[in-house]
């Protein structure tokens, strides 16, 4: 029981640790931290709204499309709605605000993942939580890399839109993998696919963000 508690704590702090690592070299780390907290707070009303719609998609449903919608829409797309609210409250579409929007999304997905872990504390199987964490980390790194690259172009807003489209495509792929894993016992194959996507995300982030900073 104690071991599970330690693992759960480690899973919960993984996203904030990834955030601090990703934005350690940001121009204004304090501003990025404030944006992270802002996103985490904005996620609260979305979580309440999400709980209302989740009743239409039972977690033990035998329908592939319902499980896919549950993974993609409720665990992945819902936190994205924090971004327009964040940009609206920031009252700015400048490059700094757009990059800070990624920090806000890190906070939003951290809140969603915390609730995801909390609601499954009694489930001894950690696979779903670990895969959800890998999904979030992989795609947030990809988003940060693409947004950082697009901010160096002449049309940063269009670059952000393109980055979000890639983000959604990656999310659809990840949700598909998780759905297949839900209906099939070959977990090693599907976790390997997510791990491969995570490796690509790390390389993309390294070349788009780290090398540019240095």
Swiss-Prot record:
Keywords: Cell membrane, Membrane, Transmembrane, Transmembrane helix
Membrane-traversing stretches: 4-23, 35-57, 67-89, 96-118, 128-150, 155-177, 187-209
Principal location listed in the UniProt entry: membrane
Keyword Ribonucleoprotein recorded: no
Topology in membrane: Multi-pass membrane protein
Protein's cellular compartments: Cell membrane
The keyword Cell membrane is assigned to this record: yes
GO cellular component, one term: plasma membrane
Protein name: Uncharacterized protein TP_0473
């Amino acid at each position: 029981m104690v071991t599970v508690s330690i693992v759960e704590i480690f899973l919960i702090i993984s996203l904030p640790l990834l955030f601090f690592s990703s934005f350690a070299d940001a121009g204004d780390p304090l501003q990025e931290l404030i944006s992270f907290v802002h996103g985490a707070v904005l996620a609260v009303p979305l979580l309440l709204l999400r709980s209302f719609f989740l009743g239409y998609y039972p977690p033990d449903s035998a329908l592939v499309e319902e499980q896919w919608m549950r993974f993609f829409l409720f665990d992945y797309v819902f936190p994205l709605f924090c971004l327009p609210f964040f940009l609206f409250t920031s009252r700015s579409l400048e490059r700094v605000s757009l990059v800070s929007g990624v920090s806000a999304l890190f906070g939003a997905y951290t809140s969603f993942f915390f609730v995801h872990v909390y609601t499954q504390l009694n489930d001894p199987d950690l696979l779903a939580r670990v895969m959800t964490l890998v999904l979030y980390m992989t795609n947030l790194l990809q988003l940060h890399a693409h947004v950082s690259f697009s901010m160096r172009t002449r049309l940063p807003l269009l670059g952000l839109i393109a980055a979000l489209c890639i983000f959604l495509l990656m999310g659809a792929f990840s949700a598909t993998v998780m759905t297949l894993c839900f209906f099939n016992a070959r977990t090693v194959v599907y976790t390997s696919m997510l791990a491969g996507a995570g490796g690509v995300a790390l390389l993309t982030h390294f070349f788009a963000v780290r090398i540019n900073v240095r």
